[in-house]
Amino acid sequence: MKKLTLIFAAIFISFGNISAKDYILEQQGKRTLVKEHIYSNTDNLKVFKLEGTFKDNAGNFGEVNSIVNVITINNVVEKLEASNELIYNDNVKAYNTAKRANNELKQGVGKWYFTHASKSINAIINSECIYSIRYYKDNFLTLGKCEIPDKAFEQIKNI
C-alpha cells in the first residue's frame, strides 16, 4: 500500500510540473450558407462556411476558415460541429474541431480540440480551448482561450 501511495504521489507531482500557457485567439469574418436540407417545417441540416482573419496573443495574424454543420430538430439546434483551419505566416497550419453540446448552443460557448498541425507547431495537438462565438447578420466574432504547453506557445511565437 505504501508503494502504491508513493507511485500516485510521483505521478501527481510529475503532472503538476507540466506547465501550460494561455493562448488567446480572436477570429472575425463572414458566414455563408453553403447548403441546406429542409426535412420538414421544423427540422433541417445547414452547412455554413466561415472565412476571415485571426490574431493571437503570440503576435500572429492570419487567415481562418471553417466548415460548420448545424442540425435543427423541432426548431431547436440539437447539434453543432465544425472543422477550423488556421493559416499562419509561411503557410503554417493548425486544425481544430469544435463541438457544442445542446446545453451550450444558446450560450454560444463550446470547446475546440486541436487535432492536426504543421510540424513546426505540432506541440499544440491535443490542446483544448473554450470559445465563444457571436453573430451579427452574416458576420462572426469568436474569442477562444486555450491552455497549451509552453513548448507549443514558443513554437507559435517563432512563426
Question: Which ranges hold each PLM region?
Answer:
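Beta-strand-enriched cores of mature, soluble protein domains
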Residues: A20-I159
